[in-house]
Every structure is written in structure tokens, then in C-alpha cells.
Amino acid sequence: DRSCPATSGELGLSRGSEGRLPQGVVSGGQTGADRAALDAALEAAFPCGGWCPCGRRAEDGVIPARYPLLEVACTDYPERTQRNVRDSDGTLIVYRRTLSGGTRLTAALCRREHKPLQLIDADQTDPVCAARTVADFVTREGIRVLNVAGPRASGWPGAQAFSCAVVGELLALARADAANGRR
């Protein structure tokens, strides 16, 4: 029954024991920031998943099957956004200048659900510094499953590259952390 909230286990992720960096990444699979997070996780063989609209709907058509996403029962973007916020421990929003549309909704849902939120303005930092900020956020808030959100590609053409670089660097930090026995 897809009307019931997912658990991290249903998404294929484990909240696991305490550690310094996340054990899984989720997003809604939209073009831009969402898909970049999944691409970075898949490239690093890092656990990922999340919720997407029914029919795997995105602005570029159907979200490719290579992205391990579960479908909500409706085609509404807000429903999948709400599920990803609720089923994660905290959210990273990567954006440029101002929050708008679904990105603004994600921030509002985090506040409503009392979920930790880290905002990264690409105009104010570079991907390496941003990843360190996110690592500190994840550590401070005890986040095991990190939701990643931000503008779709049509709203910010650089969202894919910047977000992929941030999440890729974060996952490299996670690997180094694990290699040093901190996980």
C-alpha cells in the first residue's frame, strides 16, 4: 500500500549505528539537483533511493529505471517531496540565490516536520567547501539518511553539475571517514 509512509528499510536504506556521515541519500529524481544526488551516489556505489511521482514523472519525461525510486500513488510532486522529507533524517537544499517552487516547498516541509535543514547557496561557496559544511551538518544533527533537493534543470541549468560535485565530495569524505575507522 503506497499510501502508507515508507520506512528507511522500504527505501532500501538502513539508519544503522551512529557515524559521522550519512549511510544513504534520497531524492525525488527530478532533473537538476535531485538527479545529481542520485548520480553521485550511484557513481560511488553508495546506497540511494527515494520517492518519485506515479509514472516516474519528471520534466524530461520518465525517470530512468536505473534510479532506485519508489512511486507514490499520485502524480503530484508535493506528495513525493513530503515523503522524502518525512522518511529522511534531514535535508540538504542546494540552490542559487533564492528558494522558489518545489525547493521552497521542501524547506517549508522541513520546518513543518521539524526536520533538520541545511541550505547551500551555490553563489556563496564552492562544492568542496559546501561538502564540508554538509558533513558538519550531518554530524551535528546525527543524520543517517540525507534527503537532497534543489531546483530542476530548467530552473537552474547549473544545478546538476554543482549538486553532483557537492554530493560526490560528501561521499568521498564518507569513504575517507570509513577508511579511518570513524564509521
What function would you assign to each model-found segment?
Residues 11-145, 152-155, 159-177:
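Acidic/glycine-enriched connector segments
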Residues 177-183:
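Divalent-metal-activated hydrolytic enzyme cores
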